[in-house]
Amino acid sequence: MTRRHASAVDPCGIAHAVGVLGDPWSLLVLRDVAGGRTRFDQLVAETGISRKVLAQRLDALVSDGVLERRAYSDRPPRHEYVLTALGRGALPVLAALQEFGDTWLLGDGSPDAGAATDSNEVTRVSGLVGQAIPRLHALDPVTDEPFTVVYCYPGNAFPGADEIPGGIGCTLESCTYRDRLGEFADLGASVVGVSTQRPGEQAAFAAANRIRFPLLSDADLELTTALRLPTFRAGGTTRLKRQTFVVDRDRVVRATLFPIPDVTGSVEEALGLVRALGRG
């Protein structure tokens, strides 16, 4: 494999980034490590590339400081690969590629906080059922309750929300969960909201609307890239499309809701999903 790193005196950041991440296989390896597939055999199965090529890419990503190799078995010797701070810094690149592919290559280029029911995004989200949410560096949306309802939303009152299909409704959605929080608790479920807004913005929103459950910031796009969640761009920010997951205490996604055309109706649907899962 030929790697072409930019000259140390080249002032172009893109050139330097391409030298580390420009190889397509390296990007897919980074995608899958971000998604919790940290062991060699897992990466072979997910990427479909040969073991020799995978070993080369992993060695290069470790050498460039994107991944760290950690031993998890002495006999036989086995290693897993985890993101370094540099690797986590590349997550917005993955999110941008995902959004570009969804919006411009698989879509018509129009920003949308929802999705067509027959879209690739819907297929990807529904495919999360049975998948475990990996441990993340900056946030953890999974609680110790039997179930956690994780609802992702674009962000309250973001610029241009009224011009984007599905953009309006974040405050109503959060307040509906607030008003029905006791019903979820009675079913052994907690509620967590996630957006890519900064923690300070979320704290102000929670205080103004008396939100009594966690609102978590995925500003660094860890959860977004781990689960390959659909996003769109608005107000100069990558924003999560409106989507909901029911997760069990083992971190496994048990049910999903996407797209969400009715924010208050989705809260009722989430209650129904928890109720059905509780009955086994």
Predicted features, each with a name:
Residues 44-72:
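Canonical helix-turn-helix DNA-binding module
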Residues 22, 73-96:
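Basic, amphipathic "hinge/linker" alpha-helix immediately C-terminal to the N-terminal HTH DNA-binding motif
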Residues 120-280:
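Chalcogenol-based redox active-site neighborhoods
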Residues 19, 36, 53-56, 60, ...:
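Short glycine/proline-centered loop/turn elements that form peptide/ligand docking sites
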Residues 1-9:
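Long, low-complexity, charged/polar intrinsically disordered regions in eukaryotic proteins
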